[in-house]
């Protein structure tokens, strides 16, 4: 039984190893979302620790979540779906599903913690970028930034504050754990 469990675990890593970080970076070269994707990847790695998952696996999902952004910009209902097609067989189905579910316009509802964590990380990255948040930051700075961002993007409050509250996460701590910047 233990051997079967280890084989199953190794199979999961082999699927995830279907694409290396270097290859993912090459796929993203020239993308308007290159730096955003790196930030989302780092946030996902930090979040993985809160949910007892493998940081590199969640980081890869964050890194590749907007791979099709430039291609699907005029057709947001396809955003995420095209990435899932490109990466089919190279990432686990759960990862591809999270990528499809991260944008509400795709029609794929988030159901797993990975789905919801990617939405959180994507929205938190947008908040950090738009509000030019630097680390270390305080809870006050972060909540002021959320308030400012919600004027143009009202969904940020639910996707960031709502998720953090439901999961018992301190947003400012997550931001500070991504490192200086």
What are these regions (language model features)?
Residues 26, 51-153:
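Divalent metal-dependent catalytic cores for phosphoryl transfer on phosphate-bearing substrates
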Residues 154-159:
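C-terminal binding/interaction regions
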Residues 13, 47, 86, 162-163, ...:
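Residues within well-ordered alpha helices
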Residues 164-181:
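Charged phosphate-binding loop/patch that engages nucleotide di/tri-phosphates or the phosphate backbone
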Residues 6-75:
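Acidic/His-rich, divalent-metal-binding segments that scaffold phosphate/diphosphate chemistry
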Residues 1-5:
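Hydrophobic alpha-helical membrane-insertion segments
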Residues 33, 110-113, 167, 171:
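Residue-level recognition of alpha-helical structural elements
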């Amino acid at each position: 039984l233990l051997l079967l469990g280890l084989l199953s675990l190794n199979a999961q890593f082999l699927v995830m190893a279907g694409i290396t970080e270097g290859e993912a970076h090459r796929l993203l070269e020239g993308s308007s979302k290159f730096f955003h994707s790196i930030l989302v990847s780092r946030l996902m790695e930090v979040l993985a620790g809160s949910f007892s998952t493998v940081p590199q696996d969640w980081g890869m999902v964050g890194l590749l979540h907007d791979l099709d952004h430039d291609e699907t910009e005029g057709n947001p209902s396809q955003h995420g779906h095209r990435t899932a097609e490109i990466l089919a067989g190279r990432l686990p189905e759960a990862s591809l599903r999270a990528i499809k579910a991260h944008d509400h316009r795709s029609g794929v509802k988030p159901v797993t913690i990975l789905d919801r964590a990617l939405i959180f990380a994507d929205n938190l990255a947008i908040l950090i970028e738009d509000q030019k948040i630097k680390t270390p930051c305080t809870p006050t700075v972060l909540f002021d930034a959320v308030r400012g961002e919600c004027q143009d993007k009202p969904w940020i409050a639910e996707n960031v504050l709502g998720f953090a509250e439901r999961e018992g996460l301190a947003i400012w701590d997550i931001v500070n754990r991504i490192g200086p910047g």
